[in-house]
Amino acid sequence: MKTLNRRDFPGAQYPERIIQFGEGNFLRAFVDWQIDLLNEHTDLNSGVVVVRPIETSFPPSLSTQDGLYTTIIRGLNEKGEAVSDARLIRSVNREISVYSEYDEFLKLAHNPEMRFVFSNTTEAGISYHAGDKFDDAPAVSYPAKLTRLLFERFSHFNGALDKGWIIIPCELIDYNGDALRELVLRYAQEWALPEAFIQWLDQANSFCSTLVDRIVTGYPRDEVAKLEEELGYHDGFLDTAEHFYLFVIQGPKSLATELRLDKYPLNVLIVDDIKPYKERKVAILNGAHTALVPVAFQAGLDTVGEAMNDAEICAFVEKAIYEEIIPVLDLPRDELESFASAVTGRFRNPYIKHQLLSIALNGMTKFRTRILPQLLAGQKANGTLPARLTFALAALIAFYRGERNGETYPVQDDAHWLERYQQLWSQHRDRVIGTQELVAIVLAEKDHWEQDLTQVPGLVEQVANDLDAILEKGMREAVRPLC
């Protein structure tokens, strides 16, 4: 069986206009996949040079396959049908290592056609590293490497204002573009680079903050033989991902034209502020996960897919989203409903086995950041507690007993909560405290909740009633009236 290469698999090759820091699965099934579609359907005509930003020889370089690899996108489409779509990606030209090919790395700045910089160097990548120097070949941190590359471009083109870059980080931190820009400016000042360079950074370059959303499941280890048989070639860089994707970029409106988004519709939004989109994702996608997990798991289910195929649990989650979360969010209702519909479709994806216990990690913090704001906003707006979000809190407290149908399961959270719950549930079993007292102790933890939740009218009583119902009847019976 042949391995992918451009001689045996000839096709389009595009001029290099994009630098990408990061060779991982996510960017290859997200950014490079989108660039490939735009290259095929528009005159974007842009090839990617992947820069491996860390010193590692594993996985091997994409250049061993001349930059070619296959994405397999699978999940439920807009009609709810299971689809699997294989695509040979031709947008990547080559990969270079910043450690073993430093001169080649700097030469990227000399190419007048270069226009975009994408990156995903993990959440820790956009950070300051104290020892980084201008003459390091290379510096350790990604922002320092980028500063050096930008200075190379500034010098080579004598500060020409039409030679700046559009820099689009995809790292999962808030306002990643702003954070990256601040670090680049910090290195420029620390290295005493000329004032003209600092002005050029601001005038000629755009640092765009982003929100990225796609579950990328990566190399399909267990299915490789079968998939390669179907494809008819060997591909060491096979990459799998879900059908859904969303790319929100906070940047100049002209970006839509530059990326040719006006000529081919991708799920990419160019916006003035990513904040409402971030809030939407946290409240609907992450919030639904967090409400679902303790309810579904204690109802005897193990994966998100099983939960969504269970009529009652699915109804509980959908009613929580549409009746309790969406009404208190600050974006047009139709936009929120269309996003919510995509979310529930993603939860049903038959190709992804998402274990409830793995999502349960750090459940107390997740409840505070993802559900509590909507619970409190609903109470404030209507004068009554949202029934399902309140029930989810009771289910969460019950979850920390660590026992289902007589069998124990691992609960992962910080030591404070694990010890606290062990003590509280032990006292409850010994009848030292009642359910209402247990709930009041949990809700009074100001250090965690950032407020005293026992002061929210009716919350302790409602959570205690729900918790008693769960303990007496079991989760199935207790949740039924809310389905």
Swiss-Prot record:
NAD(+) binds at I18, I19, Q20, F21, G22, E23, G24, N25, F26, L27, R28, A29. Pathway: Carbohydrate metabolism; pentose and glucuronate interconversion. The keyword Cytoplasm does not apply. GO terms for cellular component: cytosol. Pfam families: Mannitol_dh, Mannitol_dh_C. GO terms for molecular function: mannitol-1-phosphate 5-dehydrogenase activity; tagaturonate reductase activity. InterPro entries: 6-PGluconate_DH-like_C_sf, 6PGD_dom2, Altronate_OxRdtase, Mannitol_DH_C, Mannitol_DH_N, NAD(P)-bd_dom_sf. One of its GO terms (biological process) is D-galacturonate catabolic process. Keywords: NAD, Oxidoreductase. It is an enzyme of class 1 (oxidoreductase). It comes from the Bacteria. Belongs to the mannitol dehydrogenase family. UxaB subfamily. This is Altronate oxidoreductase.
